Amino acid sequence: MTLEIRAACSPGEVRIAVMNDDTLVDFAIWRPGRTDGVGDLHRGRITARVPAMAGAFVALDGADGFLPDTEGAAGATAGTILGVQITRAAQGNKGPRLTAKLDAHEQAMIGSGPPVLVRRGPGPLSRLAALHPEAPVLLDDPGLAATLRPTLGARLTLVRAAFDAELSARIDALADPIVDLPGGASLSIHPTPALTAIDVDAGATTATRGVKGAVQFALNRGILPMLAAEIRLRNLSGAILVDFAGLAARRREALGPALTDALANDPLRPRLLGFTRLGLAEIVRPRIHPPLHELLVGPHAAGLAALRQAASDIAVNPGRALALRAAPSIIAALQPDPVALDDLARRAGRSLVLRADPSLHATAWVLEPAIA
Protein backbone atom coordinates (compact mmCIF):
# COMPACT_ATOMS: atom_id res chain seq x y z
CA MET A 1 0.00 0.00 0.00
CA THR A 2 1.39 3.38 -1.08
CA LEU A 3 -0.45 6.45 0.18
CA GLU A 4 0.01 9.79 -1.56
CA ILE A 5 -1.65 13.19 -1.15
CA ARG A 6 -2.09 15.15 -4.38
CA ALA A 7 -3.10 18.82 -4.30
CA ALA A 8 -4.18 20.46 -7.57
CA CYS A 9 -4.17 24.25 -7.24
CA SER A 10 -6.19 26.82 -9.16
CA PRO A 11 -7.03 30.44 -8.29
CA GLY A 12 -8.78 30.46 -4.93
CA GLU A 13 -9.13 26.70 -4.71
CA VAL A 14 -7.12 23.57 -3.95
CA ARG A 15 -8.56 20.14 -4.78
CA ILE A 16 -6.97 17.48 -2.61
CA ALA A 17 -6.96 13.76 -3.38
CA VAL A 18 -5.58 11.00 -1.18
CA MET A 19 -4.50 8.05 -3.29
CA ASN A 20 -3.80 4.48 -2.21
CA ASP A 21 -1.83 3.30 -5.23
CA ASP A 22 -4.39 3.98 -7.99
CA THR A 23 -7.45 4.13 -5.73
CA LEU A 24 -8.97 7.42 -4.58
CA VAL A 25 -9.64 7.07 -0.85
CA ASP A 26 -10.27 10.66 0.27
CA PHE A 27 -11.11 13.97 -1.35
CA ALA A 28 -11.54 17.54 -0.14
CA ILE A 29 -11.81 21.05 -1.53
CA TRP A 30 -9.94 23.89 0.15
CA ARG A 31 -10.93 27.48 -0.60
CA PRO A 32 -8.54 29.67 1.40
CA GLY A 33 -10.57 32.81 0.71
CA ARG A 34 -13.80 31.27 1.96
CA THR A 35 -13.14 28.59 4.55
CA ASP A 36 -15.89 26.71 6.37
CA GLY A 37 -14.49 27.95 9.69
CA VAL A 38 -14.17 24.59 11.44
CA GLY A 39 -11.40 24.80 14.02
CA ASP A 40 -11.35 28.62 14.02
CA LEU A 41 -10.81 30.19 17.44
CA HIS A 42 -12.94 33.26 18.20
CA ARG A 43 -13.54 35.77 20.92
CA GLY A 44 -17.34 35.89 21.02
CA ARG A 45 -20.14 37.56 22.91
CA ILE A 46 -23.30 35.81 24.06
CA THR A 47 -26.28 37.64 22.56
CA ALA A 48 -29.17 35.52 23.81
CA ARG A 49 -29.86 32.54 26.02
CA VAL A 50 -32.31 30.07 24.48
CA PRO A 51 -33.47 27.62 27.18
CA ALA A 52 -35.75 25.81 24.72
CA MET A 53 -32.68 24.92 22.65
CA ALA A 54 -30.46 24.25 25.69
CA GLY A 55 -27.86 26.76 24.62
CA ALA A 56 -27.05 30.31 23.61
CA PHE A 57 -26.40 32.33 20.48
CA VAL A 58 -22.94 33.84 20.27
CA ALA A 59 -21.89 36.80 18.12
CA LEU A 60 -18.67 36.11 16.24
CA ASP A 61 -16.64 38.26 13.88
CA GLY A 62 -19.08 38.48 10.96
CA ALA A 63 -21.44 35.68 11.98
CA ASP A 64 -23.47 34.15 14.78
CA GLY A 65 -22.96 30.67 16.18
CA PHE A 66 -24.75 28.37 18.60
CA LEU A 67 -23.13 27.25 21.85
CA PRO A 68 -24.89 24.31 23.57
CA ASP A 69 -25.15 24.27 27.34
CA THR A 70 -23.10 21.08 27.34
CA GLU A 71 -20.26 22.92 25.55
CA GLY A 72 -20.06 25.89 27.90
CA ALA A 73 -23.21 27.99 27.62
CA ALA A 74 -24.73 26.79 30.91
CA GLY A 75 -24.76 29.60 33.46
CA ALA A 76 -23.58 32.27 31.01
CA THR A 77 -25.68 35.40 30.45
CA ALA A 78 -26.22 37.78 27.56
CA GLY A 79 -23.21 40.06 27.12
CA THR A 80 -20.68 37.53 28.42
CA ILE A 81 -17.38 37.63 26.49
CA LEU A 82 -15.80 34.21 26.04
CA GLY A 83 -13.53 32.16 23.84
CA VAL A 84 -15.17 29.67 21.49
CA GLN A 85 -14.09 27.33 18.73
CA ILE A 86 -16.15 26.24 15.73
CA THR A 87 -16.79 22.49 15.79
CA ARG A 88 -19.30 22.22 12.94
CA ALA A 89 -19.71 24.37 9.86
CA ALA A 90 -22.83 26.39 9.20
CA GLN A 91 -25.66 24.45 7.58
CA GLY A 92 -28.44 26.08 5.59
CA ASN A 93 -29.88 28.83 7.76
CA LYS A 94 -28.16 27.47 10.86
CA GLY A 95 -24.96 29.10 12.03
CA PRO A 96 -21.85 27.18 13.07
CA ARG A 97 -21.83 24.98 16.17
CA LEU A 98 -19.42 26.08 18.91
CA THR A 99 -17.60 24.85 21.97
CA ALA A 100 -16.13 26.89 24.82
CA LYS A 101 -14.02 23.96 26.04
CA LEU A 102 -10.58 25.38 25.26
CA ASP A 103 -7.17 24.38 26.51
CA ALA A 104 -5.10 26.76 28.63
CA HIS A 105 -3.08 28.07 25.68
CA GLU A 106 -6.20 28.81 23.63
CA GLN A 107 -7.89 30.46 26.59
CA ALA A 108 -4.88 32.73 27.10
CA MET A 109 -5.20 33.95 23.49
CA ILE A 110 -8.76 35.22 23.88
CA GLY A 111 -8.23 38.50 25.75
CA SER A 112 -10.98 41.10 26.03
CA GLY A 113 -12.85 43.30 23.60
CA PRO A 114 -15.40 42.88 20.82
CA PRO A 115 -15.87 39.64 18.85
CA VAL A 116 -12.87 38.83 16.69
CA LEU A 117 -11.28 35.90 14.88
CA VAL A 118 -8.28 34.95 17.01
CA ARG A 119 -6.80 32.09 14.97
CA ARG A 120 -7.70 30.16 11.86
CA GLY A 121 -8.24 26.43 12.16
CA PRO A 122 -6.38 23.91 9.99
CA GLY A 123 -7.43 23.68 6.35
CA PRO A 124 -8.27 20.42 4.54
CA LEU A 125 -4.71 19.89 3.32
CA SER A 126 -3.33 20.17 6.84
CA ARG A 127 -6.05 17.87 8.19
CA LEU A 128 -5.43 15.19 5.57
CA ALA A 129 -1.66 15.47 6.04
CA ALA A 130 -2.18 14.88 9.77
CA LEU A 131 -4.56 11.98 9.12
CA HIS A 132 -1.97 10.33 6.85
CA PRO A 133 1.34 11.37 8.47
CA GLU A 134 3.51 9.09 6.32
CA ALA A 135 2.03 10.15 2.98
CA PRO A 136 4.09 12.44 0.73
CA VAL A 137 2.34 15.59 -0.50
CA LEU A 138 2.55 16.44 -4.21
CA LEU A 139 1.51 20.01 -4.98
CA ASP A 140 1.57 22.01 -8.23
CA ASP A 141 1.72 25.66 -7.11
CA PRO A 142 5.10 27.19 -6.14
CA GLY A 143 3.56 29.94 -4.01
CA LEU A 144 1.51 27.57 -1.88
CA ALA A 145 4.42 25.15 -1.69
CA ALA A 146 6.60 27.90 -0.20
CA THR A 147 3.89 28.69 2.36
CA LEU A 148 3.46 25.06 3.42
CA ARG A 149 7.08 23.92 3.37
CA PRO A 150 7.83 25.06 6.96
CA THR A 151 5.14 22.69 8.27
CA LEU A 152 5.33 19.84 5.73
CA GLY A 153 9.10 19.91 5.19
CA ALA A 154 10.53 17.02 3.20
CA ARG A 155 7.07 15.50 2.71
CA LEU A 156 6.28 18.23 0.18
CA THR A 157 7.23 17.88 -3.50
CA LEU A 158 6.47 20.47 -6.17
CA VAL A 159 5.20 18.85 -9.37
CA ARG A 160 4.07 20.18 -12.74
CA ALA A 161 0.53 18.78 -12.44
CA ALA A 162 -0.86 17.08 -9.34
CA PHE A 163 -3.79 15.48 -11.21
CA ASP A 164 -3.51 13.49 -14.41
CA ALA A 165 -6.45 13.06 -16.79
CA GLU A 166 -7.60 9.84 -15.15
CA LEU A 167 -7.66 11.31 -11.64
CA SER A 168 -9.38 14.47 -12.90
CA ALA A 169 -12.10 12.33 -14.46
CA ARG A 170 -12.54 10.40 -11.22
CA ILE A 171 -12.88 13.65 -9.29
CA ASP A 172 -15.37 15.06 -11.80
CA ALA A 173 -17.46 11.90 -11.43
CA LEU A 174 -18.08 12.75 -7.77
CA ALA A 175 -20.48 15.45 -8.96
CA ASP A 176 -22.61 12.88 -10.81
CA PRO A 177 -25.53 11.40 -8.84
CA ILE A 178 -25.16 8.12 -10.75
CA VAL A 179 -22.22 5.85 -9.92
CA ASP A 180 -21.66 3.01 -12.37
CA LEU A 181 -20.41 -0.17 -10.71
CA PRO A 182 -18.76 -3.27 -12.19
CA GLY A 183 -21.15 -5.70 -13.87
CA GLY A 184 -23.81 -3.14 -14.77
CA ALA A 185 -25.02 -2.26 -11.27
CA SER A 186 -25.19 1.36 -10.16
CA LEU A 187 -25.78 3.69 -7.22
CA SER A 188 -28.16 6.63 -7.46
CA ILE A 189 -27.31 9.26 -4.84
CA HIS A 190 -29.82 12.01 -4.07
CA PRO A 191 -29.17 14.46 -1.20
CA THR A 192 -32.14 16.40 0.21
CA PRO A 193 -32.24 18.96 3.04
CA ALA A 194 -33.42 16.24 5.44
CA LEU A 195 -31.41 13.18 4.36
CA THR A 196 -29.49 11.50 1.57
CA ALA A 197 -31.23 8.70 -0.30
CA ILE A 198 -29.09 6.08 -2.06
CA ASP A 199 -30.70 3.55 -4.38
CA VAL A 200 -28.88 0.41 -5.50
CA ASP A 201 -29.84 -0.67 -9.02
CA ALA A 202 -28.90 -4.23 -9.96
CA GLY A 203 -29.04 -3.50 -13.68
CA ALA A 204 -28.24 -6.55 -15.76
CA THR A 205 -26.34 -8.32 -13.01
CA THR A 206 -29.33 -10.33 -11.80
CA ALA A 207 -29.66 -11.89 -15.25
CA THR A 208 -26.85 -14.21 -14.18
CA ARG A 209 -27.97 -17.79 -14.04
CA GLY A 210 -28.49 -19.13 -10.54
CA VAL A 211 -30.82 -18.74 -7.63
CA LYS A 212 -32.08 -15.18 -7.98
CA GLY A 213 -32.14 -14.44 -4.25
CA ALA A 214 -28.58 -15.66 -3.79
CA VAL A 215 -27.38 -13.63 -6.77
CA GLN A 216 -29.03 -10.46 -5.49
CA PHE A 217 -27.67 -10.93 -2.00
CA ALA A 218 -24.16 -11.43 -3.38
CA LEU A 219 -24.57 -8.33 -5.56
CA ASN A 220 -25.61 -6.14 -2.65
CA ARG A 221 -22.89 -7.50 -0.42
CA GLY A 222 -20.29 -6.97 -3.14
CA ILE A 223 -21.06 -3.28 -3.62
CA LEU A 224 -20.79 -2.38 0.08
CA PRO A 225 -17.12 -1.27 -0.06
CA MET A 226 -17.91 0.96 -3.06
CA LEU A 227 -20.98 2.35 -1.30
CA ALA A 228 -18.91 3.22 1.77
CA ALA A 229 -16.22 4.78 -0.45
CA GLU A 230 -18.72 7.08 -2.19
CA ILE A 231 -20.19 8.19 1.14
CA ARG A 232 -16.71 9.16 2.33
CA LEU A 233 -15.51 10.77 -0.91
CA ARG A 234 -18.65 12.89 -1.24
CA ASN A 235 -18.63 13.65 2.50
CA LEU A 236 -22.30 12.69 2.78
CA SER A 237 -23.47 13.33 6.31
CA GLY A 238 -26.44 13.33 8.61
CA ALA A 239 -29.13 10.74 7.88
CA ILE A 240 -28.38 8.39 4.96
CA LEU A 241 -30.94 5.83 3.77
CA VAL A 242 -29.89 3.00 1.44
CA ASP A 243 -32.38 0.98 -0.62
CA PHE A 244 -30.69 -2.26 -1.61
CA ALA A 245 -31.63 -4.05 -4.82
CA GLY A 246 -34.19 -6.81 -5.06
CA LEU A 247 -34.09 -8.22 -1.54
CA ALA A 248 -37.04 -8.74 0.76
CA ALA A 249 -36.93 -6.46 3.79
CA ARG A 250 -36.23 -9.33 6.18
CA ARG A 251 -33.21 -10.50 4.14
CA ARG A 252 -31.59 -7.09 4.06
CA GLU A 253 -30.76 -7.20 7.74
CA ALA A 254 -28.26 -9.97 6.97
CA LEU A 255 -26.18 -7.31 5.17
CA GLY A 256 -25.74 -5.42 8.45
CA PRO A 257 -22.41 -6.89 9.65
CA ALA A 258 -20.76 -6.50 6.24
CA LEU A 259 -22.04 -2.92 5.91
CA THR A 260 -20.70 -2.07 9.37
CA ASP A 261 -17.31 -3.48 8.35
CA ALA A 262 -17.33 -1.45 5.12
CA LEU A 263 -17.98 1.76 7.06
CA ALA A 264 -15.31 1.05 9.68
CA ASN A 265 -12.40 2.68 7.80
CA ASP A 266 -14.14 6.04 7.60
CA PRO A 267 -12.45 8.46 10.06
CA LEU A 268 -15.83 10.06 10.88
CA ARG A 269 -17.06 6.68 12.15
CA PRO A 270 -20.49 6.48 10.51
CA ARG A 271 -22.90 4.12 12.26
CA LEU A 272 -25.45 1.69 10.90
CA LEU A 273 -28.51 2.21 13.09
CA GLY A 274 -30.45 -0.68 11.62
CA PHE A 275 -33.09 -1.26 8.94
CA THR A 276 -36.53 0.29 8.65
CA ARG A 277 -39.65 -1.82 8.23
CA LEU A 278 -39.35 -1.12 4.51
CA GLY A 279 -35.84 -2.57 4.54
CA LEU A 280 -33.94 0.71 4.16
CA ALA A 281 -30.53 0.76 5.83
CA GLU A 282 -30.28 3.71 8.23
CA ILE A 283 -26.80 5.22 8.47
CA VAL A 284 -25.83 8.32 10.40
CA ARG A 285 -22.56 10.10 9.66
CA PRO A 286 -21.46 13.18 11.63
CA ARG A 287 -21.69 16.46 9.78
CA ILE A 288 -18.64 18.61 10.47
CA HIS A 289 -17.71 20.11 7.09
CA PRO A 290 -20.12 20.85 4.22
CA PRO A 291 -20.75 17.88 1.91
CA LEU A 292 -19.27 17.97 -1.57
CA HIS A 293 -22.59 18.55 -3.33
CA GLU A 294 -23.01 21.81 -1.40
CA LEU A 295 -19.51 23.00 -2.26
CA LEU A 296 -20.03 22.44 -5.98
CA VAL A 297 -23.08 24.68 -6.41
CA GLY A 298 -23.73 28.40 -6.18
CA PRO A 299 -22.18 31.58 -7.60
CA HIS A 300 -18.87 31.31 -5.75
CA ALA A 301 -18.27 27.75 -6.98
CA ALA A 302 -19.16 28.84 -10.52
CA GLY A 303 -16.78 31.78 -10.28
CA LEU A 304 -13.91 29.58 -9.13
CA ALA A 305 -14.60 27.19 -12.01
CA ALA A 306 -14.30 30.17 -14.36
CA LEU A 307 -10.99 31.21 -12.79
CA ARG A 308 -9.69 27.64 -13.09
CA GLN A 309 -10.49 27.69 -16.80
CA ALA A 310 -8.93 31.14 -17.16
CA ALA A 311 -5.72 29.95 -15.51
CA SER A 312 -5.63 26.95 -17.85
CA ASP A 313 -6.12 29.17 -20.91
CA ILE A 314 -3.42 31.60 -19.78
CA ALA A 315 -0.97 28.75 -19.18
CA VAL A 316 -1.38 27.77 -22.85
CA ASN A 317 -1.31 31.38 -24.12
CA PRO A 318 0.55 33.52 -21.55
CA GLY A 319 0.06 36.77 -23.44
CA ARG A 320 -3.70 36.53 -23.61
CA ALA A 321 -5.70 39.17 -21.71
CA LEU A 322 -9.03 37.77 -20.57
CA ALA A 323 -12.31 39.10 -19.28
CA LEU A 324 -14.89 37.20 -17.30
CA ARG A 325 -18.44 38.01 -18.36
CA ALA A 326 -20.71 36.48 -15.77
CA ALA A 327 -23.97 36.79 -13.91
CA PRO A 328 -23.87 39.61 -11.34
CA SER A 329 -24.16 37.03 -8.55
CA ILE A 330 -20.87 35.44 -9.65
CA ILE A 331 -19.05 38.77 -9.78
CA ALA A 332 -20.45 39.65 -6.35
CA ALA A 333 -19.27 36.30 -4.95
CA LEU A 334 -15.73 36.63 -6.32
CA GLN A 335 -15.01 40.24 -5.38
CA PRO A 336 -14.92 39.71 -1.57
CA ASP A 337 -12.76 36.58 -1.92
CA PRO A 338 -9.35 37.82 -0.69
CA VAL A 339 -7.44 35.08 -2.50
CA ALA A 340 -8.99 34.02 -5.81
CA LEU A 341 -8.68 37.09 -8.04
CA ASP A 342 -5.24 38.02 -6.67
CA ASP A 343 -4.09 34.45 -7.27
CA LEU A 344 -5.13 34.60 -10.92
CA ALA A 345 -3.47 38.02 -11.32
CA ARG A 346 -0.23 36.56 -9.92
CA ARG A 347 -0.33 33.74 -12.45
CA ALA A 348 -1.32 35.92 -15.41
CA GLY A 349 0.73 39.01 -14.65
CA ARG A 350 -2.42 41.12 -14.98
CA SER A 351 -5.84 41.41 -13.39
CA LEU A 352 -8.85 39.68 -14.86
CA VAL A 353 -11.42 42.09 -16.27
CA LEU A 354 -14.83 41.49 -14.67
CA ARG A 355 -18.05 42.18 -16.57
CA ALA A 356 -21.43 41.66 -14.93
CA ASP A 357 -24.09 40.55 -17.41
CA PRO A 358 -27.63 40.48 -15.97
CA SER A 359 -28.85 38.49 -18.98
CA LEU A 360 -26.91 35.42 -17.83
CA HIS A 361 -28.21 32.74 -15.48
CA ALA A 362 -27.11 33.00 -11.84
CA THR A 363 -24.24 30.54 -12.33
CA ALA A 364 -23.45 31.19 -16.02
CA TRP A 365 -20.19 32.70 -17.22
CA VAL A 366 -18.14 33.26 -20.40
CA LEU A 367 -14.43 33.93 -20.85
CA GLU A 368 -13.72 36.40 -23.64
CA PRO A 369 -10.95 38.74 -24.82
CA ALA A 370 -10.41 41.66 -22.47
CA ILE A 371 -10.53 44.10 -25.39
CA ALA A 372 -13.96 43.75 -26.98
Segments and roles (model prediction):
Residues 1-36, 40-43, 47, 81, ...:
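Extended, charged alpha/beta regions that create polyanion-binding interfaces
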Residues 3, 54-58, 90-100, 106, ...:
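Conserved glycine-centered short motifs in functionally critical loops
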Residues 10, 50-51, 77-78, 127-134, ...:
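Flexible, charged surface loops at secondary-structure boundaries
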Residues 17-18, 56-61, 66-68, 85, ...:
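Short, acidic/hydrophobic/Gly-rich beta-strand patch recurrent on exposed beta strands
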Residues 28-33, 57, 63-75:
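Beta-strand/loop nucleic-acid-binding surfaces
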Residues 51, 63-65, 146, 328-330, ...:
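Extended acidic low-complexity intrinsically disordered segments
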Residues 61-62, 151-152, 348:
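Short, structured coil segments at secondary-structure junctions
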Residues 65-78, 89, 93, 244-245:
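Alpha-helical multi-pass transmembrane bundles of energy-transducing inner-membrane proteins
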